[in-house]
Amino acid sequence: MSSLRQSEIKRKTNETDISVFINLDGNGISEIDTGIPFLDHMLHQISSHGLFDLKIRAIGDTHIDDHHTNEDVGIALGKAFSKALGERKGICRFGHFFAPLDEALVQVTLDCSGRPHLSYDLQLKAPRIGNYDTELVKEFFIAFVNNSGITLHINQIRGSNSHHIVEACFKAFSRAMRMATEIDLRRSGSIPSSKGMLENQ
C-alpha cells in the first residue's frame, strides 16, 4: 500500500476546465475557486471537517448558469477520491455521521464499495441559497457518487433553513468520508471485502 494517498485530476470539456488535487491524509488545508461562491463554501467544509487537503480550480460557463461547473466539479472530485483510494486496501470502508447546524440535523451513511448509488432525502424549501440553485446539491452528489464508486445515503432528520440543512449535509458527508477512508490498523492492509476486491464499476 502506497504511503501517499493523494491524486490529481484534470478535466477539460467545451463547458468547463477543472483541476483537483486531494491528499486523503492531510490537515484540512484547502485552496478552492470554482466561480460558484456557495459551492466553494461547501467544498471548504469537506476539506476542513474531513481533514483532506484539497485544491480545486474551475473555469466554466457560469455566465449561462452554474449547472455544468457544479456537476463537473462533482465528477472531478469523485474521480480524485477514487484514484487516491487506489485498490482501497486497509480502509475502514464504511462511514456515518450525524451533523447538526442550529435547527437542522442531517445523517450521512456511506460505503466505499465500488458500487455507485445515491439515496437523497433533503427537503429544501428555498429555490436558491444566495445565487445557488438548491437543485444543484443533488446534482453534485450524483456526479460525485457515479465517479467515486461509493454508496451514499443522505437523510434529513429535521430542519427548516435550507442553508443550514445543506451545510449540515456537507459536514456530515465530510466526517463520514473521513471515517470510511481512514486506515484500519487491525486490517493490516487487506481489502475490506469478503470478495477480496473493491472496484469502481
Curated annotation (Swiss-Prot):
**How would you classify this enzyme at the top EC level?**
lyase
* Cleavable signal peptide: none
InterPro entries noted in UniProt: IGPD_sf, ImidazoleglycerolP_deHydtase, ImidazoleglycerP_deHydtase_CS, Ribosomal_Su5_D2-typ_SF
Listed under catalytic activity are: D-erythro-1-(imidazol-4-yl)glycerol 3-phosphate = 3-(imidazol-4-yl)-2-oxopropyl phosphate + H2O
Q: What is the lineage of its organism?
A: Bacteria, Bacillati, Cyanobacteriota, Cyanophyceae, Synechococcales
Keyword set includes Transcription = no
BP terms from Gene Ontology:
L-histidine biosynthetic process
Q: What is its EC number?
A: 4.2.1.19
Compartment(s) of residence: Cytoplasm
Q: Which UniProt keywords apply?
A: Amino-acid biosynthesis, Cytoplasm, Histidine biosynthesis, Lyase
Name this polypeptide is given: Imidazoleglycerol-phosphate dehydratase
Q: Which GO terms describe its cellular component?
A: cytoplasm
Q: Which residues cross the membrane?
A: none
Instruction: Check the record and name the Pfam families matching this protein.
Output: IGPD
Natural source organism: Prochlorococcus marinus (strain MIT 9301)
Pathway(s) where this gene product acts: Amino-acid biosynthesis; L-histidine biosynthesis; L-histidine from 5-phospho-alpha-D-ribose 1-diphosphate: step 6/9
One GO MF term on file is: imidazoleglycerol-phosphate dehydratase activity
Q: Which family does it belong to?
A: Belongs to the imidazoleglycerol-phosphate dehydratase family.
